[in-house]
From Swiss-Prot:
One of its GO terms (molecular function) is imidazoleglycerol-phosphate dehydratase activity. One of its GO terms (cellular component) is cytoplasm. This is Imidazoleglycerol-phosphate dehydratase. Belongs to the imidazoleglycerol-phosphate dehydratase family. It is an enzyme of class 4 (lyase). PROSITE patterns: IGP_DEHYDRATASE_1, IGP_DEHYDRATASE_2. Its EC number is 4.2.1.19. It comes from Methanocaldococcus jannaschii (strain ATCC 43067 / DSM 2661 / JAL-1 / JCM 10045 / NBRC 100440) (Methanococcus jannaschii). The gene is hisB. InterPro entries: IGPD_sf (IPR038494), ImidazoleglycerolP_deHydtase (IPR000807), ImidazoleglycerP_deHydtase_CS (IPR020565), Ribosomal_Su5_D2-typ_SF (IPR020568). Keywords: Amino-acid biosynthesis, Cytoplasm, Histidine biosynthesis, Lyase. The keyword Nucleotide-binding does not apply.
């Protein structure tokens, strides 16, 4: 799961609200071990890892007695911090995916640009799917973009909220897998000569 000459990043974050450990192998095979205390969120992160072919470990403990906001937010922050460690030379940089799931379809486009921006149109019709507050899905992606210094655009259509959310996380994984692919021809993919703030 983790070994060899691979791009592996590890983040730990502890606050009064949460305690998060996250480890991701960008060059993995889609193995995962996830426990956030929010089973449907675990399912979404597993879908991201599996379809992006990332090996992912997430151990999170948060103030779920209040609600799930801080846990979802801080996992997003940790994933963003991990992704921000990716060497920007010799990667594809851009990634995109259109993923259907029954009635739902999600489109994701990302740019590992060194600039954070998140634009999404996920508008849930239900307050919860399982034990996850659906409003926190948008906040998760905002947190990833902000701390990962990447640009994320996403659109979701469909009827079933489970399908919409799962298609979105699958599409994010597939798009990120493409963006992080090694391509020795590319060097730094910017007319500025660098990808950072």
């Amino acid at each position: 799961m983790f070994g060899g000459n691979m791009r592996i990043f590890e983040v730990m974050r502890e606050t009064k609200e949460t305690n998060i450990y996250l480890k991701i192998n960008i060059d993995g095979t889609g193995k995962y071990k996830i426990d956030t205390g929010i089973p449907f969120f675990d399912h979404l992160l597993a879908s991201f890892a599996k379809h992006g072919c990332f090996d992912l470990i997430v151990k999170a403990r948060g103030d779920l007695e209040i609600d799930d906001h801080h846990t979802v937010e801080d996992v997003g922050i940790c994933l963003g911090l991990a992704l921000n460690q990716i060497e920007k030379r010799n990667i594809f940089r851009f990634g995109w995916a259109i993923i259907p799931m029954d009635d739902a379809r999600a489109t994701v486009a990302i740019d590992l640009s060194g600039r954070s921006y998140c634009v999404g149109n996920y508008e849930p019709k239900r307050e919860f799917v399982g034990d996850l507050a659906t409003e926190n899905i948008n906040h998760f992606f905002e947190s990833v973009a902000s701390y990962g210094m990447l640009n994320i655009h996403y659109e979701v259509i469909g009827k079933n909220e489970h399908h919409k959310a799962e298609a979105l996380f699958k599409a994010f994984g597939v798009a990120l897998d493409l963006a992080t692919k090694i391509d020795e021809r590319k060097g730094v993919i910017s007319t500025k000569g660098e990808v950072k703030l």
